[in-house]
Amino acid sequence: MREPDFLNHFLKKGYFKKHAKAVLALSGGLDSMFLFKVLSTYQKELEIELILAHVNHKQRIESDWEEKELRKLAAEAELPIYISNFSGEFSEARARNFRYDFFQEVMKKTGATALVTAHHADDQVETILMRLIRGTRLRYLSGIKEKQVVGEIEIIRPFLHFQKKDFPSIFHFEDTSNQENHYFRNRIRNSYLPELEKENPRFRDAILGIGNEILDYDLAIAELSNNINVEDLQQLFSYSESTQRVLLQTYLNRFPDLNLTKAQFAEVQQILKSKSQYRHPIKNGYELIKEYQQFQICKISPQADEEEDELVLHYQNQVAYQGYLFSFGLPLEGESIQQIPVSRETSIHIRHRKTGDVLIQNGHRKKLRRLFIDLKIPMEKRNSALIIEQFGEIVSILGIATNNLSKKTKNDIMNTVLYIEKIDR
């Protein structure tokens, strides 16, 4: 194939329509060097600004020389290049994580929104076979995605439909370690695939076909289940166990960087079935939150360094706090105004719950923890509930319960009213 053929493929696919700046992961191998040649030659036609990024893994004597040559290449092409050196104990997984962390840093620094890699069809076959041997979940056997959105960036693999033999022989660096069978991928490439192709000369096509078929099923299930609210457990549990598993797995596809193992997936299933309330980190910065018949998986929110101090409100004063207007003894007008009988003899304290909090109801003391459980108050609401306190005792849990003190105060000569209005925060 000629370079213009690759350009036409890129334009037809519209890989770069949404992007003005793209970072190319440049290893120096034939595939990435040819991709560099195509992208740098046709920057104008593709309407992109190209930025190069290279990781020197420091595993071969030649790697420092190759780094220098890539710097020269970038200078000749008048393109910026960012380079980082891997350090620490080497493994395939550590190196991959290091590369992608570095690429994201470069993208953040340059304002690029696309990361372009030179993965091709042969890489896809190796990846699917590796995952099959390791016993991965079915959805991952669809292989590497042609386009993949991760957070605010998009990873684009424009060579995924081409084999390495489709690329012309141009200047590149040959990694001699690829001929060694120390790493799993090398054993797949050098040993397992050639043996399997003896049994079926079209084995590579067969593997790619299976991957595409799994992807079709995955997309079809996502489309068919679009109107099912999986986070509603009553709805989820109305289906058979098998359908529940498929729906839950499809729901998890929304979080591409979560990557639960089979054991972790089974644990999530068990929590959804057995726990009434649950909030705990699960993996990769995500947490699982369950509140009775609802659950969600979301990124862990950063916590404030310090808890907000409690608020003290004096008689005949007003204050806006946590989305409410509190008016101590000064009437507020409106249909949605809450009124709580209080005493004007001392100030009112407004705060969130504390360990050991007790509410008096019908002459009986009840711990807030037990009250919340009995009333099935969701954990989020428990943590955000506002406590109104006077004389060292809880007068009211806003919108949830009041105690006998407020009823007694209603008939007291020193009584007044705390007026509360919901306002926009």
From Swiss-Prot:
Record-level GO cellular component terms: cytoplasm
UniProt-listed Enzyme Commission number(s): 6.3.4.19
Catalysed conversion reaction: cytidine(34) in tRNA(Ile2) + L-lysine + ATP = lysidine(34) in tRNA(Ile2) + AMP + diphosphate + H(+)
Binding site for ATP: S27, G28, G29, L30, D31, S32
Keywords from the UniProt entry: ATP-binding, Cytoplasm, Ligase, Nucleotide-binding, tRNA processing
GO terms, biological process: tRNA modification
Subcellular location: Cytoplasm
Listed InterPro entries: Lysidine-tRNA-synth_C, Rossmann-like_a/b/a_fold, TilS/TtcA_N, tRNA_Ile_lys_synt, tRNA_Ile_lys_synt_N
Pfam families: ATP_bind_3 (PF01171), TilS_C (PF11734)
EC category name: ligase
UniProt cross-references to SUPFAM superfamilies, sorted A to Z: Adenine nucleotide alpha hydrolases-like (SSF52402), PheT/TilS domain (SSF56037)
Function: Ligates lysine onto the cytidine present at position 34 of the AUA codon-specific tRNA(Ile) that contains the anticodon CAU, in an ATP-dependent manner. Cytidine is converted to lysidine, thus changing the amino acid specificity of the tRNA from methionine to isoleucine.
Family, per entry: Belongs to the tRNA(Ile)-lysidine synthase family.
Record's comment describing the protein's domains: The N-terminal region contains the highly conserved SGGXDS motif, predicted to be a P-loop motif involved in ATP binding.
Protein name from the UniProt record: tRNA(Ile)-lysidine synthase
Protein source organism: Streptococcus pneumoniae (strain P1031)
Gene: tilS
